[in-house]
Amino acid sequence: MGTDISDIVVSHQTSLKDQANQVFAIDTYNILYQLLSNVRQYDGTPLMDSSGNVTSHLYGIFYRTVNLVENGIKPIFVFDGKPSPLKNRTLEIRQLAKEKAKAELEEAISRGEENLKQYYSRINYITPQIVNDTKELLTYMGIPYVDAPSEGEAQASYMTRKDADGVISQDYDCLLFGAKKILRNFAIYGRRKVPRKNVYRTVYPEYVMLDEVLKKNGINQDQLIEIGILVGTDFNEGIKGIGAKKALALIKKEGNIKAVLNKIGKNIENLDEIIDFFKNPPVVDVKYVFGKPDPKKIEEFLCVVHDFSRDRILEHINTYVKYYNKSVQFRLDSF
């Protein structure tokens, strides 16, 4: 979900080729939820193998990783760890929304509706099996992954202050965590339908630079965090009626979030803890190593274990190995 500060960010249209020869830390759960929502069969049910295992995520991770490497990008996947207790309320709200969607799905089925995608797409769970399958596929593809101690986007953002060039994520929360660069829309560009509306718009890959956002708005990192909190984050609901532009104006006028809250007579529970979490989240220093792809293992895992089309997979495996060899050169260098 993240924080909606889009009205005050500076974004630049780009292409994957323009980002070549860079290392990107990927907010993996952000990507997995996209895949589980969007990669579905015509009736809305997720892709599954003959054993009934969901494979939507494997389809998406494989093809998106091929696309990244083909364009010269070195990806490192970052997985979420244990969520902060500050996130409990948000997780409860999401669970209630899923239960409501389940009830609506059952009603739609009983009415005989055929297109159930809008219901299924709102009921997504990242299970331990989905996580383990994703890691297994990445291992066969020679792609490193990192287990974050807590929030994946916090770990990925921290990595941009070390060795990574940026974060791949749709969430602007990464800016609050200090990511120096975000790459958005890398896999959803093109003509896309606006959710719940019969309207289409063209989406392009874009990048956002943290320093540019701060400079444009005349604020520092602490103030950006406080703007995000006023708008709402995964750790708080925000103040009703305050969007990014209004939050920016209030912070610049009053100086800090506590002065703003005092001025408008509002309160944000656990404010100090939320601010501290954005500034000092649990992260780890890691050494990531790019391995050598194992085409046979990739083929066996996708085509034998999970029933993917062999002809199509083999074609893309060959493409992947070709470009991986060129961009990563099978070196066991750490970044």
UniProtKB/Swiss-Prot annotation:
Binds 2 magnesium ions per subunit. They probably participate in the reaction catalyzed by the enzyme. May bind an additional third magnesium ion after substrate binding. Its EC number is 3.1.-.-. Gene3D superfamilies: 5' to 3' exonuclease, C-terminal subdomain (1.10.150.20), 5'-nuclease (3.40.50.1010). Mg(2+) 2 binds at D171, D173, D234. CDD domains: H3TH_FEN1-Arc (cd09903), PIN_FEN1 (cd09867). Residues 115-255 are annotated as: I-domain. It is an enzyme of class 3 (hydrolase). Coiled coil: none annotated. SMART domains: HhH2, XPGI, XPGN. GO terms for biological process: DNA repair; DNA replication, removal of RNA primer. It holds the Pfam family XPG_I. Its cofactor is Mg(2+). Mg(2+) 1 binds at D27, D80, E151, E153. Interacts with PCNA. PCNA stimulates the nuclease activity without altering cleavage specificity. Belongs to the XPG/RAD2 endonuclease family. FEN1 subfamily. NCBIfam families: fen_arch (TIGR03674). Structure-specific nuclease with 5'-flap endonuclease and 5'-3' exonuclease activities involved in DNA replication and repair. During DNA replication, cleaves the 5'-overhanging flap structure that is generated by displacement synthesis when DNA polymerase encounters the 5'-end of a downstream Okazaki fragment. Binds the unpaired 3'-DNA end and kinks the DNA to facilitate 5' cleavage specificity. Cleaves one nucleotide into the double-stranded DNA from the junction in flap DNA, leaving a nick for ligation. Also involved in the base excision repair (BER) pathway. This is Flap endonuclease 1. It comes from Thermoplasma volcanium (strain ATCC 51530 / DSM 4299 / JCM 9571 / NBRC 15438 / GSS1). The gene is fen.
